[in-house]
Amino acid sequence: MNNTRKKTLAIVLRRTDFGEADRIINLLTPGGKVSAMARGVRKPKSKLAGGIEFFALNEVVLIEGKSEMRTLSSARMREFFGEILKDFERTEFAYQAIKTVSWLCEQIESDDFFEILLTVFRSLNNFEIDLSLTKKWFNLKIAEFSGDEINLESDKNGKPLQADLTYNFDFYDKVFVEDSEGDFNANHIKFLRLMLSSQPQIISK
């Protein structure tokens, strides 16, 4: 059977040295998580090295054979989010997001993880977007896909959330509880809905 070449966008999740000059690269693509062997990538003049950097959107060509391990045929960087590296907290959270998404890809099959991680990188790269906003957005999106999402439609008793009422939040059941002296009102709920339906770049404006 002939090997198949496939061009795709990819984000590097992990790089592991293999042998004297190779690396095994874990990539997140729009179609999911894949592993590829980058042969000779650690050699000084390797043409692959520039296309497998962390915090970047890369365009790669993968050769698919009989095994699950692909071979990286070519790689070039499309977009580099280098501003992230200028701030320790943003860098730390970017690595945390990579680790979280990589783990979830093993548990849940979804094409959305690629766009989620790419959005996180673009948001962290823009210092006009507050770091806390990006963190909240990411955590809400991850909770949505891991079955731990917040109920933003009805309260604990199944009644639709009302604009003229206040609520407290049940962290165990991830649901709002009606309370006349509650800490959460319609504005808080509206903001959470906006977070789930939009992106940090838009919310921050």
Residue ranges of predicted features:
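Non-catalytic alpha-helical scaffolds and adjoining flexible linkers that form interface surfaces
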Residues: 1-24, 28-205
